[in-house]
Amino acid sequence: MTAQRLELVAPSGGRLTVTLPGDRPVSSLAAGVRFAGGSYGTGFQIGPRGYHDFACTYVAPAKARDRFLVHGREVVVAEADDRESSVATLIGTYHELMTVYAGPAPRSDRVSALFGSLEITDHADGMVVRPRAGTLLETMAEQIAIVVKDRGSLSVPGPRQALAMVPKHAGARTRFGEVWKSASPGAAGKYSFILGCPAGLAEVHLADAGGLDWLAEIDVAWHE
C-alpha cells in the first residue's frame, strides 16, 4: 500500500511527521493549544482559512459583531444567535486562530489584549503560537487532529503530554510501534486506540472495526 506523509508545524513550533496509508485522503486538519499562568488559562483552536466562517455557519450559528486589527492581522468577533457563546478569530495568511467565550461577545479591548499577548507566526504547514515574554503564561498542552475519510481520526498530543499516556504494559505490535485498546469514557462498547511509535504517540478513533489494518501502518514522529 502506498503511503502519504504529512509534514506539520505544531503550535509550539515543533515539527511533526505523520505517515499514513495513502488509500484515503485527509479530510480535515486542525490543532489546539492551551496556555496557563497562575489562576488564568485560555485555549485556542487553529484551522485552515475559512475555519471561522465554517464554525459560525455549521457548528454554532453566529453573526459577526466586530472587526479590528491586532499587530496588522484582522480579528473577527462573532456572537451566537442565542447569545450563549461567542468566538474571536485572528485571520492569518494560511490559518485562523480561534478562541471561544461564554456569553455575549466580549469588548474589543479585551479581545485585542488577549491576541496581543501572543507571538504568532503563520506557515503553510502550521501556525506557531507562543505567549510573549513578560505575560507569565506557559504552554500547557497542544495537539494536532487529523481526520481521514472513511478511516477515522488521530489526535496527536505534544511530546510532554504523550509521556503520561503510554501504558506500562506492552501493546500489540504494529509496523512502526505498538498499540493499546482503550475504553471510551461514558460510551459503553466504544473504544479508542493508543498508538505508540518511537518518536510520537496518537489517540486513534476508527470509523469501523475493519480499520485495524490501516492503523497498523501509521507512524507518528516528532523532530528535535
Predicted regions and their residues:
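Intrinsically disordered, low-complexity prosegments and terminal tails associated
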Residues: 1-224
